[in-house]
């Protein structure tokens, strides 16, 4: 019983020390606060200004939170992951390949497709910025240009016209004048449409196998046997015989360059 008052006494002492520390920091001398590093800008040789390293680090860490959305919405990731998911459903193997393998394959194929764009971003934006030749604002503009060109090549004109009309933009003078708020949803819509078109083409041969197997089982009176169990080996054999992985992944990569 004697330990209980000691516990409350220690808790009250710690609480008092915390309050005292907070009050001390509040009334700290202004000279102490002045010694802390501030957020300033640095002049560049060409007359521009650049932020201090602390602000650059803060901007970088903040931009990392948007990296998944940028990877999903502004690259080839969306088309590839949808086609591979539809292929898995068409084969009738919902757990093979596993999600981790599917995501890893999609990421590596995305980096392969986007490597020319990433090389341009590195050469035209990051390298001059790291050598203090350009400011961060100019680096962002130069880095966004290759991504814009990639997105414009993959976007249908009908989708651009739709979102231009919804944004109430009167007239766009050339592709370089398309604003990002119009280009992003138009690009995603085009990618979804293209992915489902490729998925439909992938589904057709496996659907034919399912129909043939189901018809044979009904003709033999084996209606209690699930057709998916019988058709799975035939679908796997067909996919292996035509070298399906090479055909599909090669076609996916080529679809971004045609």
From Swiss-Prot:
GO terms for biological process: bacterial-type flagellum organization; protein secretion. It holds the Pfam family FliP. InterPro entries: FliP, T3SS_IM_P. It is found in: Cell membrane; Bacterial flagellum basal body. Keywords: Bacterial flagellum, Bacterial flagellum biogenesis, Bacterial flagellum protein export, Cell membrane, Membrane, Protein transport, Transmembrane, Transmembrane helix, Transport. PROSITE patterns: FLIP_1 (PS01060), FLIP_2 (PS01061). It is a multi-pass membrane protein. Signal peptide: none annotated. One of its GO terms (cellular component) is plasma membrane. The keyword Ribonucleoprotein does not apply. The chain crosses the membrane at residues 20-40, 64-87, 98-118, 194-213, 220-242. Plays a role in the flagellum-specific transport system. Belongs to the FliP/MopC/SpaP family. This is Flagellar biosynthetic protein FliP. It comes from Pectobacterium carotovorum subsp. carotovorum.
């Amino acid at each position: 019983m004697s330990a209980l008052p000691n516990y409350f006494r220690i808790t009250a002492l710690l609480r008092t020390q915390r309050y005292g520390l907070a009050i001390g920091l509040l009334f700290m001398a202004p000279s102490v606060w002045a010694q802390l590093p501030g957020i300033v800008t640095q002049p560049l040789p060409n007359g521009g200004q650049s932020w201090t390293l602390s602000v650059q680090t803060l901007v970088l860490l903040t931009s990392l939170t948007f990296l998944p959305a940028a990877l999903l919405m502004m690259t080839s990731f969306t088309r590839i992951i949808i086609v591979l998911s539809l292929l898995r459903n068409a084969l009738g193997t919902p757990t093979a390949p596993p999600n981790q393998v599917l995501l890893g394959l999609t990421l590596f194929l995305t980096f392969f497709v986007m490597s020319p764009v990433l090389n341009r971003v590195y050469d035209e934006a990051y390298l001059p910025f790291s050598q203090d030749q350009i400011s961060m604002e100019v680096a962002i503009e130069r880095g966004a240009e290759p991504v814009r060109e990639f997105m414009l090549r993959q976007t249908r004109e009908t989708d651009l016209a739709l979102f231009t009309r919804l944004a109430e933009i009167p007239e766009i003078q050339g592709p370089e004048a398309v604003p990002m708020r119009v280009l992003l949803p138009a690009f995603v819509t085009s990618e979804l449409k293209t992915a489902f078109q490729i998925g439909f083409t992938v589904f057709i041969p496996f659907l034919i196998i399912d129909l043939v197997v189901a018809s044979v089982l009904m003709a033999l009176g084996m209606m209690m046997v699930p057709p998916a169990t019988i058709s799975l080996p035939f679908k796997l054999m067909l996919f292996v015989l035509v070298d399906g992985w090479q055909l599909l992944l090669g076609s996916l990569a080529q679809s971004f360059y045609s």
